[in-house]
């Protein structure tokens, strides 16, 4: 048998079973007919229709997506329902041997949308991005969900979100049967009696470097966000990633969402926001997941992309360093630092501008890389220890290049005596019973109606639960060797609240001292969240005379939580004595020292104020005084 004949036979066999590998990368080819586009780079070929939807994406001759159900498409949801892009214009932005870029644009709507597609000659798949522009009527139609979806070929059933959530997705046929037995939104009984819900396949944004699907023939399609600076709500947001439907498996790149505590987006008139570019990556590999993870890391190293030209995308950025000093002597390591372009509200509800985040190291130092030039508010909150307060510093101007914020002195609210604390502050329920469980429908059935937690004897990982989900009373029993003087302060950091009616009455030795009710539904508990929804902070001050020497009881009685609702707990602590607090206005920071000597003048024109979550989940100013560091 000749070598040529053997090659022909092998090629025929591989093609027959869908394993024909694509050829090497070539120069990018772009073909345009009216508003229909075809892009190819030798490895992958993508066809985009006049509606702005990609109806085909092939690896060699192998079709990877389901064009009959939308393929790759942008859509958004409002109170009026789901809406598509509906473009009326197509522009060729760039066409070279290295890359091509096209932009589909709508020209009407309460919010104007555009979607771009980019193919390069060194990566398989396609980059895409979305530009949203506010109009005078944007407020009449708040945007609940904004996303780019990829409908996959029916055999793409190996799903991956992270190391904990991955595995086989139900087939289209299995989902068709399941959808006849709906429990709640996107939640169904499968034929074997188990429950399938897309919310099991959600993830925290900060954990998501790549998510996607692959088939048993080793072809995969992956979403690689590269940078989440553009996602509304910053690092504590949770969003949908991968799930199954009766039409097709689907991967989702959420751009904006209300899921699990987020808020609807309303852009101001003339305000523009760029989401992306992110990569929809195609591969064929003996280990598609390992390959996709490697590519994700490589893409992150290349951010910001120097090949992407857009007025909304600055290539020259700032690297911002600083040192956090916690003046009360509490931990300054493991503190989240966030730069965001909104202020005064809970981070997960932010919908304007861009976000950047990091965590302080063992010395309290931090660095934020590749920050877009602009004006920001700095948020800081602990991810470990007993600090439940929050820092905000407004009007921080970031420019290009290396910049230092110097030392930021923070005096979080603290009292002379910490009697006890259940859990550790990090805005999540981890460390409590069932909190290490993967997302799953029905977990809320496991916590008890009533419990007693004994300080010094009970263990949080066994005796305190991730959520209080049933009408009943949770009791904390503790001893005091002596009676505190003055006031005592009971603080609860909630990782979430599901169902707006969820209410806890707080009693100290049988006397009611407060009622805790966020009044907002983040849907976290019944949508499979185990660790968090939207954060809330409650702090109740009461006369220490309500306590006594010896055994004391503080109880938390849940009511109004309805079906599958309640509180997710982060931590609960009891303090007493004088407050060890002072506003940031009382402290001269290194920032001011630098400004006094002429340093940082190009960096700062800021005012600083410390604010904390209020007792009802909003924000209040501590001290009420803004300080200009550029005096």
Which residues make up each language-model segment?
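Beta-strand-rich ligand-recognition modules
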Residues: 471, 479, 485, 494-579
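A short, solvent-exposed beta-strand micro-motif common in secreted/extracellular proteins
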Residues: 364, 374-385
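Structured interaction patches on ligand/partner-binding surfaces of diverse proteins
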Residues: 383-407, 411
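A contiguous, surface-exposed recognition patch within enzymatic or periplasmic domains that forms
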Residues: 151-271
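Extended, loop-rich substrate-binding clefts of extracytoplasmic carbohydrate-active enzymes
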Residues: 31, 75-135
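Acidic-aromatic substrate-binding/catalytic surfaces of carbohydrate-active enzymes
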Residues: 32-89, 99
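Short, acidic Ser/Thr/Gly-rich low-complexity loop/linker segments typical of extracellular
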Residues: 345-365
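A short, amphipathic beta-strand motif
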Residues: 318-328, 364, 408
């Amino acid at each position: 048998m000749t070598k040529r004949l053997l090659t022909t036979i092998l090629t025929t066999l591989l093609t027959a079973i869908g394993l024909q590998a694509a050829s090497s990368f070539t120069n990018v080819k772009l073909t345009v007919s009216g508003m229909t586009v075809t892009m190819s780079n030798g490895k992958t070929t993508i066809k985009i229709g006049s509606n702005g939807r990609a109806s085909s994406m092939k690896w060699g001759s192998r079709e990877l997506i389901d064009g009959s159900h939308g393929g790759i498409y942008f859509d958004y949801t409002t109170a009026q329902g789901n809406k598509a892009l509906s473009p009326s214009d197509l522009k060729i932005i760039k066409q070279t041997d290295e890359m091509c870029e096209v932009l589909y644009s709508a020209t009407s709507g309460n919010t104007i949308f555009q979607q771009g597609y980019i193919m390069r000659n060194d990566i398989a798949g396609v980059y895409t991005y979305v530009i949203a522009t506010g109009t005078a009527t944007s407020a009449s139609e708040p945007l609940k969900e904004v996303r780019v979806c990829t409908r996959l070929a029916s055999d793409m059933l190996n799903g991956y979100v992270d190391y904990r959530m991955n595995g086989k997705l139900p087939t289209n046929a299995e989902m068709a049967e399941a959808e006849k037995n709906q429990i709640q939104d996107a939640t169904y009984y499968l034929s074997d009696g188990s429950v399938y819900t897309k919310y099991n396949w959600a993830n925290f944004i900060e954990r998501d470097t790549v998510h996607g699907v692959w088939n048993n023939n080793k072809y995969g399609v992956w979403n690689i966000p590269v940078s989440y600076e553009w996602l509304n709500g910053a690092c504590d947001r949770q969003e949908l990633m991968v799930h199954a439907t009766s039409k097709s498996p689907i991967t989702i790149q959420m751009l904006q969402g209300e899921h699990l505590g987020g808020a609807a987006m309303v852009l101001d008139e003339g305000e523009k926001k760029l989401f992306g570019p992110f990569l929809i990556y195609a591969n064929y590999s003996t280990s598609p997941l390992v390959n996709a993870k490697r590519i994700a890391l490589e893409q992150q190293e290349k951010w910001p992309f120097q090949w992407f030209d857009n007025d909304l995308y600055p290539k020259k950025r700032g690297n911002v360093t600083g040192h956090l000093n916690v003046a009360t002597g509490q931990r300054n390591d493991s503190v989240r630092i966030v730069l965001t372009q909104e202020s005064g509200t809970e981070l997960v509800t932010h919908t304007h501008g861009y976000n950047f985040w990091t965590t302080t190291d063992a010395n309290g130092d931090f660095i934020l890389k590749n920050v877009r030039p602009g004006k920001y508010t700095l948020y800081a909150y602990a991810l470990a220890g007993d600090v439940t307060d929050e820092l905000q510093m407004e009007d921080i101007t970031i420019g290009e290049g290396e910049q230092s914020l110097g030392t930021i002195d923070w005096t979080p609210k603290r009292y002379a005596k910490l009697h006890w604390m259940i859990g550790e502050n990090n805005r999540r329920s981890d460390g409590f019973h069932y909190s290490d469980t993967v997302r799953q429908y029905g977990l809320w059935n496991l916590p008890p109606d009533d419990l007693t937690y004994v300080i010094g004897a009970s263990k949080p990982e066994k005796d305190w639960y991730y959520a209080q989900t049933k009408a009943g009373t949770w009791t904390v029993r503790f001893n005091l060797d002596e009676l505190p003087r003055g006031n005592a302060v009971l603080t609860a950091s909630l990782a979430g609240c599901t169902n707006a009616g969820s209410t806890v009455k707080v009693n100290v030795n049988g006397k009611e001292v407060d009622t805790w009710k966020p009044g907002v539904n983040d849907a976290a508990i019944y949508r499979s969240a185990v660790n968090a929804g939207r954060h809330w902070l409650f702090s109740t001050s009461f006369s220490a005379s309500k306590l006594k020497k010896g055994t004391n009881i503080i109880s938390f009685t849940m009511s109004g939580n309805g079906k599958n609702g309640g509180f997710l707990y982060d931590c609960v602590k009891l303090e007493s004595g004088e407050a060890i607090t002072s506003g940031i206005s009382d402290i001269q920071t290194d920032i001011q020292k630098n400004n006094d000597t002429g340093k940082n003048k190009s960096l700062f024109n800021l005012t600083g104020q410390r604010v904390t979550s209020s007792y009802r989940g909003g924000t209040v100013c501590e001290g009420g005084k803004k300080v200009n560091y550029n005096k």
